[in-house]
Amino acid sequence: GDNYFNLVPKSMPGLQWWGDICVRTDIENIKKIDTKSGKESILVTLEEVNEALKNGKMPYKLTGHIKPLRTLMAASLPWGDRNVITFTQYDDRPPGQKYMIWYDFSKKKIVNLFNLQGEGPTNFDFCKENGCMAYTIGNDLYVAHEGDFSSMVNPKVTGNQQQEKDVVYGQAVHRNEFGIMKGTFWSPKGTYLAFYRMDQSMVTDYPQVNTTARIAELVPDKYPMAGMTSHKVTVGIYNVKDGKTIYLQAGDPTDRYFT
């Protein structure tokens, strides 16, 4: 009846956990929520972040200038023991370089940033021992060093282009079975980065469909059906210092699963 909408639970966008503390991000603020009383208090404001981006001292010399943020909705607080929010933003160089940026709201300054190559970076894996960030774009794996430099871990294709397009680096393998939820693993001292290399060239395409487009689009996916040929996975070791990669000699990868 007329009272229906008063009884419907209201959603609260932007909720996340900062350690054991519940926080909420919105356009202009990030707020801490008292879980007993529901009272909110401001942790950081958009104005403070943009002031640090515009006039604050950057930890590294950059080629361009970071653009101001329009919202804090996409910011995150990944570490419960640190007063740091992370977000991505572009600089003012056409077509725009994308950065992963860390802002310390207790010090009110930018404390770290990474230049991310290309569009759609994901699978971020930070190593506090060496200050590097591993991430993927498409099928490729990168390591971003602090400041204005990133290096590709997997070598650029020089041989079979068709085969290499079906090889995935640095992502979860085996369809996320066996508890595999990521594809990069830093060594204890940050000297090396272990990563999965998944060759899917022998796997048949499964006709997935993207229904979010105006007209549905075919987006084939490499999906090993039961009883059919599966992909082959090997483990690479990337040396951060010299940029060289070796692969573990673990025998024939056919129907083997590394966890």
Residue ranges and their predicted role:
Residues 1-259:
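Beta-propeller folds
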